[in-house]
């Protein structure tokens, strides 16, 4: 889980302590402060010196393509049948774009229509995308199908669900989807997954 509220405060406090109190060079103080902020985001508490000495985090893998500026396209799957669902799709699209990713959203890029009008375009959108981000709350049949289709053709999938049970998510968990139960973690997970591509 990623808990980012207060992470900036944690970074600043540890940076100042490392630089002004411990006499670290600014780059070293920033490195130590980044680690402290990562601990805070993951554990939802301020780290002690013992915490920082004994805790390790795996590095985020970044592909050569991503490092050279290429940005993967994310297919945004999710229901859009009422105001709350449309708002969530809008919010997810805006956040993914703010993270620097390209987004294909059936709601925005295809629109509403009959099965004959939209299904093949949706599937082509999945094929043309590098990964899929799914808003799964509500167990929308179309979203579930898109998740399965993406996994069947080898696309990474990040599933965001705050209300579904483990039983509801069993097939997604078992097929290698990354399951996230809060919005912030889901967004960062999508970014970290995209950075690998």
Regions found by a protein language model. Name each.
Residues 175-190:
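Short acidic-hydrophobic, aromatic-tinged amphipathic segments that line or gate anion-handling sites
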Residues 100, 128-130, 175-176:
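Short, well-ordered alpha-helix to beta-strand connector turns
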Residues 1-69:
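Conserved phosphate-binding/catalytic region of the ribokinase-like
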Residues 162-174:
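Short, glycine/polar-rich helix-capping loops at beta-to-alpha or helix-loop-helix junctions
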Residues 132-133, 157, 178-179:
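Short, well-ordered beta-strand core segments
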Residues 138-159:
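Amphipathic helical hotspot of TIR/SEFIR-family domains
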Residues 111-134, 142-146:
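TIR-domain catalytic/interaction hotspot
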Residues 38-84, 88, 92-97, 106-111:
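Charged C-terminal helix
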């Amino acid at each position: 889980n990623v808990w980012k509220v207060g992470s900036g405060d944690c970074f600043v406090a540890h940076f100042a302590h490392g630089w002004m109190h411990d006499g670290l060079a600014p780059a070293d103080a920033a490195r130590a402060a980044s680690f402290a902020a990562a601990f805070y985001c993951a554990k939802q508490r301020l780290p002690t010196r013992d915490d920082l000495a004994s805790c390790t985090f795996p590095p985020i893998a970044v592909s050569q393509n991503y490092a050279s500026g290429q940005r993967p396209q994310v297919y945004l799957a999710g229901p859009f049948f009422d105001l709350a669902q449309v708002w969530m799709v809008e919010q997810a699209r805006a956040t993914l774009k703010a993270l620097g990713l390209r987004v294909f959203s059936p709601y925005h890029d295809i629109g509403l229509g009959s099965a004959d009008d939209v299904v093949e375009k949706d599937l082509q959108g999945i094929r043309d995308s590098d990964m899929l981000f799914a808003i799964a709350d509500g167990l929308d049949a179309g979203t579930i199908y898109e998740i399965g289709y993406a996994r069947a053709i080898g696309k990474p999938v990040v599933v965001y669900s705050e209300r579904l049970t483990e039983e509801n998510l069993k097939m997604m968990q078992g097929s290698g989807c990354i399951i996230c139960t809060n919005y912030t973690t889901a967004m960062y997970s999508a970014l970290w997954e995209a950075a690998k591509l």
